[in-house]
From Swiss-Prot:
Keyword Iron: no
NCBIfam families hit by this protein: PRK04946.1 (NF003432)
Enzyme Commission number(s) from the entry: 3.1.-.-
Domain of life, source organism: Bacteria
Function description: Acts as a ribosome collision sensor. Detects stalled/collided disomes (pairs of ribosomes where the leading ribosome is stalled and a second ribosome has collided with it) and endonucleolytically cleaves mRNA at the 5' boundary of the stalled ribosome. Stalled/collided disomes form a new interface (primarily via the 30S subunits) that binds SmrB. Cleaved mRNA becomes available for tmRNA ligation, leading to ribosomal subunit dissociation and rescue of stalled ribosomes.
SUPFAM superfamilies, sorted: SMR domain-like
Protein name: Ribosome rescue factor SmrB
Molecular function GO labels: RNA endonuclease activity; rRNA binding
Keywords of this entry: Endonuclease, Hydrolase, Nuclease, RNA-binding, rRNA-binding
Membrane-spanning ranges: none
Coiled coil stretches, renumbered: none
Keyword GTP-binding: no
Example GO biological process: rescue of stalled ribosome
């Protein structure tokens, strides 16, 4: 053990002699900005606000007797009646599905806003919204909310293969 210690001390002394006259290098590390993270935060905030804007169209305070005849059928104006007819016959297949089971009205409104924002971003024009049976609260509210949104072209009760009276098929206007 003595030999090992003596070798270590000798090698340490030799190393110090060899490095005699050298000086420490100046730190030349380049620190990169966090621009990528900042851009990600800005994008996520922008997407959040876009989704929130879409959910602000849905109001609880408008007249609720708007759908007296048929609460599961709506067309924005008469130019789109052919779209509604095709939707009733099941000619359109949904590009995206939204399940609102177990959500309260506030959460459902937020999810509807997110759905419309995603559909417009991804250029999907047909959506399927499953509200289920339950206490029929969402079943009564969803057509009312959708009719208030300016980007909804038409909606109708889903065909039997897509959930029948527990779901709604929606046609969304895509902005280019």
């Amino acid at each position: 053990m003595n030999k090992n210690r003596q070798l270590a001390v000798n090698s340490n002394i030799l190393f110090r002699k060899w490095l005699n006259g050298t000086r420490e290098m100046v730190q030349d590390t380049i620190f990169h900005s966090r621009l990528h993270k900042v851009n990600q935060k800005i994008r996520s905030k922008r997407m959040f606000f876009e989704q929130d804007v879409h959910s602000n169209y849905f109001s609880f305070y408008k007249k609720k007797d708007f759908f007296k005849e048929n609460p599961v059928s709506y067309v924005r104006n008469k130019d789109f009646t052919n779209v509604l007819k095709k939707l009733k016959k099941g000619k359109y297949y949904p590009d995206i599905f939204l399940d609102l089971h177990g959500l309260n009205q506030y959460q459902a409104r937020k999810k509807l806003g997110q759905l419309i924002a995603i559909c417009q971003k991804e250029k999907m024009f047909c959506a399927h919204i499953m509200h289920g049976y339950g206490k029929n609260i969402l079943k009564k509210q969803i057509p009312f909310w959708l009719s208030q949104h300016p980007d909804i072209v038409a909606f109708h009760q889903a065909p039997k293969m897509f959930g029948n009276d527990a779901a709604i098929m929606v046609i969304i206007e895509i902005h280019s």
